[in-house]
């Protein structure tokens, strides 16, 4: 059984739900980038700001905002592994639907956080689902559209995430939050839950995964010898890939992320989300161009040029 057993309608459906899934994942990323004000208001509500001068208060806000960034990265990394393994075991479609429901429900629970520590814990757990959305969505699309160049499919999903970031930033620019309304951003982040339910109920599983699962079930005598990227001959290239992946992460999260709180300090309330919108537009264009370049000149050359930029 292969992807030819899927009708064109089923494959379009898979592409659509994967696109929407990572669109909502992008909104969650935008939320993480613009969550500094939520920390500020929670610090005030919880009484943590008592007896602090302005400089000490700003340092405390920045500290917890930095913790939120770390919570997102570690949570998404762990979620990619956990839900990726889950996708191998129970199917891409089910793992994708569960991951979307997971981060939607936990984002809703963040509405009830009473202080920055509670928010950090809830957001870390939510980010497990965000991290799980990417590998299962990409795997599902790659298996359903295997005859289409993978850079093109990855580009479409990557663009979805950046469109989600842009959309969230646009909403925050038009409707800045205050002490009375900041919890609404968590309600907004929960609107993706119905998509997860739709995926579980109506989207077919990848025939490629089904056939590989059947093959594994019929020959499970050498289970310990199953392929792993952390075993030879893949181990070396895996660590090279991990090392190369740190380049955009250092630029995107280690450096750029701090522009947003700095913008909040020196500019209007709309400046930070406007900057995030600009970054998202550039990323959307970059995702599209990267697919074209990768197909024409090769993936390695494309990645080298991307890292230079």
Task: Set out the residue ranges of the language-model regions.
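Helix-to-loop junctions at the C-terminal end of transmembrane segments
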Residues: 80-91, 287-299
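Extracellular/periplasmic helix-loop-helix junction of adjacent transmembrane segments
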Residues: 33-78
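Helix-breaking motifs and short loop linkers at transmembrane-helix boundaries and internal kinks
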Residues: 91, 112-118, 146, 298
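Extracytoplasmic
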Residues: 13-50, 251-260
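C-terminal ends and interior cores of transmembrane alpha-helices
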Residues: 101-114, 308-309
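Extracytoplasmic gate region of multi-pass secondary transporters
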Residues: 32-34, 234-287
């Amino acid at each position: 059984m292969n992807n030819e057993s899927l009708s064109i309608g089923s494959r379009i459906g898979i592409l659509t739900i994967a696109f929407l899934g990572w669109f909502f994942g992008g909104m969650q990323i935008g939320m993480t980038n613009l969550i500094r004000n939520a920390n500020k208001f929670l610090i005030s509500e919880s009484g943590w700001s008592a007896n602090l001068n302005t400089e000490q208060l700003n340092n405390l806000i920045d500290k917890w905002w930095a913790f939120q960034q770390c919570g997102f990265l570690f949570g998404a990394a762990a979620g990619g592994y956990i839900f990726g393994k889950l996708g191998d075991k129970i199917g891409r479609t089910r793992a994708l639907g569960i991951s979307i429901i997971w981060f939607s429900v936990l984002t809703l629970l963040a509405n009830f956080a009473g202080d920055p520590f509670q928010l950090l814990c809830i957001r870390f757990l939510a980010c497990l689902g965000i991290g799980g959305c990417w590998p299962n969505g990409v795997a599902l699309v790659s298996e359903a559209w295997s005859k289409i160049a993978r850079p093109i499919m990855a580009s479409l999903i990557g663009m979805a995430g950046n469109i989600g970031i842009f959309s969230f930033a646009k909403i925050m620019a038009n409707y800045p939050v205050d002490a009375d309304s900041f919890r609404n951003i968590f309600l907004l982040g929960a609107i993706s839950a119905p998509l997860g339910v739709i995926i579980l109920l109506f989207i077919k599983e990848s025939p490629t995964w089904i056939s590989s699962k059947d093959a594994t079930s019929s020959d499970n005598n050498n289970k310990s010898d199953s392929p792993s990227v952390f075993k030879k001959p893949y181990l070396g290239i895996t660590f090279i890939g991990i090392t190369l992946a740190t380049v955009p992460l250092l630029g995107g999260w280690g450096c750029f992320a701090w522009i947003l709180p700095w913008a909040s300090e020196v500019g209007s309330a709309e400046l930070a989300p406007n900057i995030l919108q600009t970054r998202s537009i550039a990323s959307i264009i970059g995702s599209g161009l990267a697919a074209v370049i990768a197909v024409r000149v090769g993936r390695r050359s494309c990645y080298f040029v991307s890292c230079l930029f």
